Amino acid sequence: MSRACPELHWRWLELHDSVSMGSRERRVRTATGTRQWRIHRRAKPRYSVLDERRLHYAAWEGCMEHVKAMLEHGVPANCQDSYGWTAVHHASFKGHLPLVKFIMQTGQVEVNSQDFFNCTPLHRSCSGGNPDTTEFLLQKGASHEARSRSGQTPLHLATANGHLGTARVLLQHLASPNPQDFHKWTPLHWAVFGGWGDVVELLLDNGADVEGGRGVGMSPLQLAVLVGNEAGVRLLLHRGADANTRGPNGQTALHMCACSGDKKILQHLLKGGAKLDIRDGDIASPLHLAARSGSRAVVHLLILNGAGLEDRDNLKMTPLHYTMLRDNAEAAKLLLHYGADVNARERLGQTPLHLASERGHLKVLKVLLDKGANPFVRSSWRETAEDVARTHNHPCILQLLQQHQMLRRRDQDAKERE
């Protein structure tokens, strides 16, 4: 029986070798014979890539017995998969604390070992939301200041995924609440982006800058407006966020809200002291952007709060001009109802009617004509709206303008006869 076991063991190895050996090893195996190859195998134990995958899968599943068997078979505890994850990375992400402790006791894995994205096991534990594993790794010397390839700390990952308990553990170990990643986002930005209100409160209670660092891009409040996080907007304003902080292209949170068309968020911003007369990098007011986006409710609310109907941007365009850009007939009606100049000229002498004719926007063109727009006005290039429609090949627009001009001339002739 004692002689049969080694032979059975060798046959098992031969079966695996037939699949796993490279061409060079096959040549050695054929030339030297079974006996010499057996000695060669014993002198230099090898493990296969398949064994590494088994180790990582066992760590992912939290199977202690399989991990022990793989390590006893000679698979290194610090071997990496195609993403650079070790068994500790896998176990930490899944929160298998006993397994993490066991692998760390082997002494083969550094607690701050990095994968191919420069993430440590602590990063992965925080990403997976495992406070107990996070606590253990921190006690073992894991750095809460370690940065991933994108500049994110473990706290960034915990807050981005809404893991309140894990974020609390990091802050209890004095992790900074205000680090910025390579996109200039702090953990507060990520919590706001994900809509994790409890995490936002935790960060603010532990000293997070409500502005996210001034002058470094978008503020948390602007980000909350951009993603439509009404609760986040309300909370940040309550905690002292400046509604008039400028972000990319000089835009404030009110500009961004005007683009998104969220009336409820707009109401919060106005109550929080947002100014209507601040211009962005294109000298556009919030009303300009609301007119372009076409949100009738937002346009109405801005007008009722005193937004200027005849404000001009860097091209001397009024909010009414902006409604022509996307055929926003309802917004145009509202602006005209409150007294916007239907024949206002921009820098090149074009009226809103010129812009509607250029883009082929039939609905808003009808609104302009119904409100008395003059089709005979010429731009700086001496073109009427009819000339523009003909140049840009909009036959429907051209036909409507010609019909309107005929009616207008008929009315003028009738008045002259009287």
Regions found by a protein language model. Give the residues of each.
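Ankyrin-repeat-protein effector appendages
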Residues: S2-R54, N206, R239, G272, ...
